[in-house]
Regions:
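Concave beta-strand-loop units of leucine-rich repeat
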Residues: 1-22, 32-94, 101-190, 196-212, ...
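Intrinsic low-complexity tandem-repeat regions in disordered proteins
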Residues: 24-27, 96
Length: 231
């Protein structure tokens, strides 16, 4: 690594593969020594080949049993990485969220399950979950995973009598249409974070205070029919 200090104009470095016993610490040291160079190093994640110059990691439906630890290690040496797809890899939502939070500039996607039978990828833009007879009745516990779906623009979780908490919408800043009617929630505070919201149905809920909606400047349609305790 020290000799690289004498090669300031080097633009490309080929390191071979991890089968050469060159560890991640050495790869990182070389990258740090030559910040302007493209450093190519071939490695394997869960029996699939990748390179440090790749822009994507696709592990969709490949079992991952270490909570994504190897992925995190590799991501630290992939400066051009744009996206990581870990759909149905068996990693917990908490571990996947930790990966996403550690690399906010990388699109990290996985699959979440909610209700009894609903599942979506975290990059989904449209969620329809208003048929308890099909996907199960939503409640505050089995709907919590929806908070990981931060790209949602259209959300329909109406007709869920047991849904008494909509905290998950606070994590949906792109939300434009929300159908939250005929549920059992009372606190509209999470909606204050949905500044792109244009259409909102919340009729026949237990909401008592609309003040959290005061900052929603793009809101054009609001249905509050049959809310009997509204101040």
């Amino acid at each position: 690594v020290q000799v690289l200090a004498y090669l300031p104009k080097v633009s490309s470095i080929q390191l071979g593969s991890e089968r050469s016993d060159l560890g991640w610490d050495s790869v990182r040291a070389i990258m740090d020594a030559c910040p302007n160079a493209s450093v190519s190093y071939t490695f394997w994640l869960y029996d699939k080949e990748f390179s440090t110059v790749d822009t994507t990691i696709n592990l969709s439906h490949i079992p991952v049993e270490d909570g994504g630890a190897q992925v995190m290690q590799a991501m630290a040496c992939m400066p051009d990485l744009v996206s990581v797809d870990m759909d149905s890899c068996g990693v917990s939502n908490e571990d996947m969220a930790a990966i996403r939070d550690a690399y906010p500039d990388v699109k990290v996607v996985w699959r979440v399950w909610f209700g009894d039978a609903y599942s979506v990828r975290t990059d989904v833009e449209r969620i329809l979950a208003s048929q308890p007879s099909v996907g199960g009745m939503l409640d505050r516990y089995n709907s919590e995973a929806l908070k990981y779906c931060t790209d949602v623009k259209y959300l329909d979780v109406g007709h869920n009598d047991a849904l008494d908490d909509i905290s998950f919408v606070a994590y949906m800043p792109k939300l434009e249409v929300a159908i939250l009617a005929m549920d059992n929630w009372s606190d509209a505070t999470p909606l204050a974070s949905c500044t792109e919201l244009e259409y909102l149905e919340m009729q026949t809920t237990l909401c008592t205070d609309l003040s959290p909606l005061s900052g929603l400047k793009k809101l054009r349609h609001l249905d509050i029919a049959y809310i009997v305790d509204l101040d």
